[in-house]
C-alpha cells in the first residue's frame, strides 16, 4: 500500500500508534526495492527498483528556521536549513541524471502541525516547489518522496492532509487492541 501511494504522491503519511510498525514498514519497503534493483532486468523494467537513500529528521526537534532557511542578521545573507539543503542537493543531482537510478526518501518522524508543515504545501501540490523566505524556489525532483511518520492527524490542517497519500496502520490488523 505504501509503495502504491508513493507512486502517485510526492508526500505520504504513515499514521498509527507508537510501536505499531510504521518505521518497519518503510524500512522493509526500502530494503526490498533496493535488493530488487540489483537485478538489472528488473531495474530496467521499473525505475522504482533501485537504491533508496533516506534522510530522517524530527521536525519538532529544531526551530523552523533550521528546517528551511535563516537570515544571518550580521552578514544579511540567507543560509539553507536542513530541509532546504537536502532538497537543493537533490535538485542539483537531478540535473545530472538521465534516468532514475536511485531514490531519496525524506522522512519526517514527528507530529504534523502548522508551525512547520504549512511551508511544505507548495512542495506537496502539483508545483512540487519549496518556496523559501529569500524568494528562491527549489524544484523537487521526481526521484524524491516525502514520508510523514505520525501518530495521528489531530493538529494537521485539511490543506496538508489533502495533498498527501495516506497509509493507516490499523491496530487490530497487526494484532493490537486500541485503548477504549
Positions of predicted regions on the chain:
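Conformational switch/transducer regions in large eukaryotic molecular machines and scaffolds
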Residues: 1-180
Amino acid at each position: 500500500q505504501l509503495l502504491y501511494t508513493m507512486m502517485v504522491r510526492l508526500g505520504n503519511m504513515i499514521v498509527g500508534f507508537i510501536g505499531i510498525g510504521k518505521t518497519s514498514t518503510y524500512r522493509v519497503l526500502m530494503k526490498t526495492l533496493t535488493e530488487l534493483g540489483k537485478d538489472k532486468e528488473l531495474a530496467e523494467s521499473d525505475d522504482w527498483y533501485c537504491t533508496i537513500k533516506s534522510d530522517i529528521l524530527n521536525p519538532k526537534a529544531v526551530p523552523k528556521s533550521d528546517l528551511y532557511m535563516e537570515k544571518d542578521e550580521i552578514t544579511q545573507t540567507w543560509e539553507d536549513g536542513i530541509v532546504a539543503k537536502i532538497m537543493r542537493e537533490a535538485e542539483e543531482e537531478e540535473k545530472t541524471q538521465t534516468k532514475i537510478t536511485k531514490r531519496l526518501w525524506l522522512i519526517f518522524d514527528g507530529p504534523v502541525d502548522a508551525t512547520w508543515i504549512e511551508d511544505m504545501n507548495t512542495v506537496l501540490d502539483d508545483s512540487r516547489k519549496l518556496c523559501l523566505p529569500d524568494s528562491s524556489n527549489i524544484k523537487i525532483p521526481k526521484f524524491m518522496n516525502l514520508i510523514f511518520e505520525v501518530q495521528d492527524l489531530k493538529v494537521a490542517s485539511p490543506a496538508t492532509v489533502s495533498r498527501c497519500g495516506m497509509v493507516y496502520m490499523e491496530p487490530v490488523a497487526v494484532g493490537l487492541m486500541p485503548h477504549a
